């Protein structure tokens, strides 16, 4: 019997991609991104898979997962049917995790459904999470150079840490490598290095996080019930809890290559990279 679940956030709209990129095949055997999350987390000891989806494609997701992974312990949670006013845009990553509360009764790893994190990352986070106390959160930190696209700029959560303890997570926009080969950012403006640690939204939590999320979601909803785009976001929640002294975040360095797609033009490079890694 294992002591770990994987929670995969697959309800985002992917507006810049122009479609449901969570269901686009990227792997050499017809895998979508979250197939690798399922396989790699199971290899790290997870025995429950929780997929957070929208109702409109829940059946399609379940059919795909069963065809690829067989009779695993699979739970689908529809974020758009969970404790929130109806609107087109999902209510954010922290709300997605709260929506999964009824399906999670053990420590769990959280990932995006449309990112590839590498086999090693799941084992590293799982190992740290098993040793973590109730008030400790685990955050995988990737080397910035391993997360940059060949073209264009991106946003990343830049980690500042004291040893392995996170002190600040700064959402940094307009990150790109300039013509001199230097990594620069637009907001806040600055220079970064290849080895700058960044968050790609891979977390490890214990179930005690749900008590905090329920309280903070109620407060958030009181203030933003009628908004169409304001989101209840996981990094903001974690930062608030850190500031209040209610939890500590342990940063786990990961040397794996991250692979993702933002625009349709990113698909072919992602497929080529995954073919090299997973064939």
Segments and roles (model prediction):
Residues 13, 114-115, 144:
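Active-site metal-binding loops of divalent metal-dependent hydrolases
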Residues 21-26, 86-87, 154:
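Short glycine-enriched, charge-decorated loop/helix-capping segments at active-site entrances
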Residues 1-20, 24:
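N-terminal nucleotide-binding beta1-loop-alpha1 segment
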Residues 81-86, 146-147, 175-177, 258-259:
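A short acidic, often aromatic-flanked loop/helix-cap motif at beta-alpha or helix-coil junctions
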Residues 119-203, 207:
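Conserved core of the sugar-phosphate nucleotidyltransferase
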Residues 77-79, 99, 140, 172, ...:
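Conserved beta-strand termini and adjacent loop/short-helix elements that scaffold enzyme active sites
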Residues 1-8, 28-110, 117, 122-124, ...:
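Conserved N-terminal catalytic core of the sugar/cofactor nucleotidyltransferase
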Residues 162-163, 177-279:
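Conserved alpha/beta core of the MobA/IspD/sugar-nucleotide pyrophosphorylase nucleotidyltransferase superfamily
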